[in-house]
Curated annotation (Swiss-Prot):
One of its GO terms (biological process) is coenzyme A biosynthetic process. Keywords: ATP-binding, Coenzyme A biosynthesis, Cytoplasm, Magnesium, Nucleotide-binding, Nucleotidyltransferase, Transferase. It is an enzyme of class 2 (transferase). This is Phosphopantetheine adenylyltransferase. Its cofactor is Mg(2+). The keyword Transferase applies. Its EC number is 2.7.7.3. The keyword DNA damage does not apply. It comes from Rhodopseudomonas palustris (strain BisB5). The lineage of its organism: Bacteria, Pseudomonadati, Pseudomonadota, Alphaproteobacteria, Hyphomicrobiales. Homohexamer. Pathway: Cofactor biosynthesis; coenzyme A biosynthesis; CoA from (R)-pantothenate: step 4/5. ATP binds at S10, F11, H18, G94, L95, R96, E104, V129, R130, P131, I132, T133, A134, T135. Belongs to the bacterial CoaD family.
Length: 165
């Protein structure tokens, strides 16, 4: 029986923090499904198609190198429902600090009540990526700052292009 893990997020944009989580997650499963949440009330910087391309180009080589099958999808329902739909038994969540842990523990508890067969696995962020958030990356890029230390090279180029004036 293969272990399927779901790694959900908005990935707007993909950051080195996300990449760090994926590097750890591929060691825990045979198949990693990255699920991009589509929220009707939110206006993302990158389109769904752009985020799908970013996720695939950055994460798929990491999964392949680890011998882990990689898939990418989108979802607009409960994250736990998306996990059930792909047959996941693990939900991967990255943690930067105690604030993340407090928030994620609440969600993990609710998810486990709704779907007892799906277990949340917390991946602590490596020291070098702990301060990185997609929100801060977008803000820095929007103000013309250099985000190359926080995102993969292709993502940095996409951000630069997005904000070119």
């Amino acid at each position: 029986m293969s272990r399927i893990a779901l790694y959900p997020g908005s990935f707007d944009p993909v950051t080195n923090g996300h990449l760090d989580v994926v590097r750890h997650a591929v060691a825990l499963c045979d198949r990693l499904v990255v699920a991009i949440g589509i929220h009707p009330g939110k206006k993302p910087l990158f389109t769904t198609e752009e985020r799908l391309m970013m996720v695939k180009s950055v994460f798929e080589p990491v999964a392949n190198a680890a011998g882990c099958t990689f898939d990418c999808t989108t979802y607009d329902n409960l994250t736990v429902t998306s996990a059930q739909q792909v047959g996941a038994t693990l939900m991967i969540r990255g943690l930067r600090d105690g604030t993340d842990l407090d928030y994620e523990m609440q969600i993990a508890g609710m998810n486990e009540t709704m779907a007892p067969g799906i277990h949340t696995v917390f991946v602590p962020a490596s020291v070098g990526v702990r301060p990185i958030t997609a929100t801060l990356v977008r803000q820095i890029a929007a103000m013309g700052g250099d985000v190359s230390a926080f995102v993969p090279p292709d993502v940095a180029a996409s951000l630069k292009s997005k904000f070119a004036g």
